[in-house]
């Protein structure tokens, strides 16, 4: 979700346009999360807001590719992993933003806690410095990915995939330090890191890629919305948070590394398909917003908490009983457009510029080599 820096080269609008689509889907995923019908496993169930089975299918559909593709695109453009000083600066930037986001998330949960949550929660909301399952995981994961690429710059790619598959056997690899998602999603970032963005863009522009992409997306949509019970067990794998044992215990699926490999294969295929339908042209408003996704991601969860607190989902279900699901889904678009306004990016720019400035001082003093 970081801005693309293309230097003197022509900017590849394909990725900005895709980032706009993906951030809309990220916001959509969090808007509908509480409205998914619980089939089995984690997620869904009684949450105090109206629910619809279509959102259970939509959740699986979205989570199969939206974060993997975001991380792949981030890997494409986060260069400079061979320069330890640059890596340190970028890593610190994401850690600081992640901590700020964790504080914002905690405040939002406390301030906008609904009566249902208050009555049905296991206890008070507490601030977890090292763990938690909030959206801030992405910031800490990005910091870890940059550091890992620096450490593994001379390693073979197969080692990255092997580690991701093996991690599921360790039940201690979970939300603590965001370890599970860091390990599970790193291969997608790493693939972007080792590939060239221009060559990727050139490949997906081929006419047959458009046709194949539409076919792949259509088939996945069919399974998600028409055969929801068949693919819904994959939900716990798609979030990247759960061990194989916990998934097997919560579902009828005998989860192993092959299950993870299957899901990663589905995600990789869908990422390629979504890349294949992207447009490499400058689209008014959309392309600009696609370059500001970091600020949208930082603030959007607070907006979702606020809408739930004030009964937005319940209002839609009552006022538009036949179409409330559609209107709830469309709400993601204005949220993204509003949060793309430049003022929402000012705090993040101040943090990143401050860290870059500090890094330059270290370099001038001869300590950043």
Language-model features and meaning:
Residues 1-369:
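Alpha-helical transmembrane segments and their immediate juxtamembrane cytosolic regions
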